[in-house]
Each structure stands twice: as structure tokens, then as C-alpha cells.
A protein has these predicted regions:
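Glycan-processing catalytic domains of CAZymes
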Residues: 1-157
Length: 157
């Protein structure tokens, strides 16, 4: 972070730690956050890799949010996984279904974070008219279309 700031004082530093279920809103963790020299912490949700159950993610992000409020530093974002593994915990990454899983991930964690990033876009979502596709074309286009259907119904400013 110091090197980046020395090169560009306007830069914003972001980190994306993994294994959110281990973090507690205790004094030790809050002290770590107070000493952290980054503007944004975007915790990986772990749902796609199976490390976090969807039904537990809200509780984990709530704990993290409380710790960030106590520390008074670093904004909290989420790095939400859009995929699942073909073979439980290994194999190809395949696009999750927006209506059956991803929207529920967003609903669970959004009360506790400022923004949601996604991991990963390339190979998981593709515009139908793209000249080059990564991943399984039909599945990645399906997820893109599901997301855009939802997005276009929102009233974002």
C-alpha cells in the first residue's frame, strides 16, 4: 500500500481475503483492521468453492461489518463467487444459476457491505454477441442474460 501511494497519491488499495468464517468481531481482529493500511477490504464469500454455506454468509458478513465499524477504517465490500465446481471442490468452474443462487447471495450479504464485486466474470458470464467466449458458451450466456434481466428491472441511479 505504501509503495502504491508513493507512486500515486490518489490510488485506492483493495485486498480480498479468503475464509470469512474464521473471522470474529473480537478485539484482536479489530486491532488488525485498525493497523491495516488499505482503503477497502473485499472479503471473498467462499460460496462458490464450497467453503461457506449460503445460509451462513449473512452472519459472517455481519460479524465482519461490526468489526469494521469498531475499527473505523477500511470500507467493507464483498467479493462474491459466481461459480461452482464441476466436481464439488475441484474440476471446471461452472456458472451458478442467478435465480436459484446468486440473487440469494446478494440478498444475504448486501446489508453488510458497501459494494459487491464478483469473482469471476471472464469464463463465467459472456454477452451473447461476444466474438470470443471463455467457458461453456451456453451456460455463460445464460448467466449473463439472467443477470441482465434482473439488472434492467432495478432502479439504480
Amino acid at each position: 500500500a505504501q509503495v502504491a501511494k508513493s507512486l500515486n497519491t490518489n490510488c485506492v488499495n483493495i485486498i480480498a481475503p479468503y475464509n470469512i468464517k474464521k473471522e470474529k468481531c473480537d478485539d484482536y481482529f479489530v486491532r488488525q483492521l485498525e493497523q491495516l493500511n488499505v482503503e477497502i477490504v473485499a472479503y471473498q464469500d467462499g460460496v462458490g468453492v464450497g467453503a461457506t454455506r449460503l445460509e451462513d454468509s449473512a452472519r459472517y458478513y455481519e460479524n465482519l461489518s461490526k468489526a469494521h465499524q469498531k475499527a473505523g477504517r477500511s470500507r467493507i465490500w464483498a467479493d462474491m463467487e459466481l461459480f461452482y465446481f464441476e466436481q464439488t471442490t475441484h474440476g471446471s468452474l461452472l456458472p451458478a444459476d442467478f435465480d436459484n443462487r446468486i440473487i440469494h447471495q446478494m440478498e444475504a450479504i448486501s446489508p453488510f457491505v458497501d459494494k459487491i464485486l464478483v469473482y469471476q466474470y471472464l469464463g463465467i458470464m459472456n454477452k451473447p454477441q461476444s466474438k470470443a467466449h471463455a467457458g461453456l458458451r451456453g451456460e455463460t450466456v445464460r448467466l449473463y442474460n439472467q443477470y441482465m434481466d434482473w439488472y434492467n428491472k432495478q432502479n439504480f441511479k
